[in-house]
Amino acid sequence: MAQVQYYGTGRRKSSVARVRLVPGEGRVIINGRDFENYIPFAALREVVKQPLVATETLGNYDVLVNVNGGGYTGQAGAIRHGIARALLKADPEYRLTLKRAGLLTRDARMKERKKYGLKGARRAPQFSKR
């Protein structure tokens, strides 16, 4: 018998997460490692769990994630986005809950590029009056 799986792709900054939800007991596996070992900060682990907490499905699915690009914050945001999209495929009734929590919106904020003549994106070289 084929097992039911729900897929979702999440993006944040330069990170892309491919998320697979499988009915299970609530394990979160990121790149083959348990998410407590993969994400070192408790606050970011909470970010990853937000869609499951919002829809009250924390112990219902095993979450299998492949994520690459970016750092911890970008990856956590991408995983959150991917889980939210996968939950939406699992049950379309979650749309209102996830949308109100702002979990279906792709966070479009990206690093601003460095401009020539400046030291960073906006930082100008030191000004000397004399």
UniProtKB/Swiss-Prot annotation:
Cellular compartments per GO CC: cytosolic small ribosomal subunit
Alphabetical UniProt keywords: Ribonucleoprotein, Ribosomal protein
GO MF term list: RNA binding; structural constituent of ribosome
InterPro entries, per the entry: Ribosomal_Su5_D2-typ_SF (IPR020568), Ribosomal_uS9 (IPR000754), Ribosomal_uS9_bac/plastid (IPR023035), Ribosomal_uS9_CS (IPR020574), Ribsml_uS5_D2-typ_fold_subgr (IPR014721)
Pfam families, per database record: Ribosomal_S9 (PF00380)
Gene Ontology BP terms: translation
Keyword Ribonucleoprotein: yes
Keyword Ribosomal protein applies: yes
SUPFAM superfamilies tied to this protein: Ribosomal protein S5 domain 2-like
Record family assignment: Belongs to the universal ribosomal protein uS9 family.
NCBIfam families reported in the protein's UniProt record: PRK00132.1
Cross-referenced HAMAP family: Ribosomal_uS9_B
The protein's name in its UniProt record: Small ribosomal subunit protein uS9
Organism from which the protein derives: Bacillus cytotoxicus (strain DSM 22905 / CIP 110041 / 391-98 / NVH 391-98)
Origin organism lineage: Bacteria, Bacillati, Bacillota, Bacilli, Bacillales
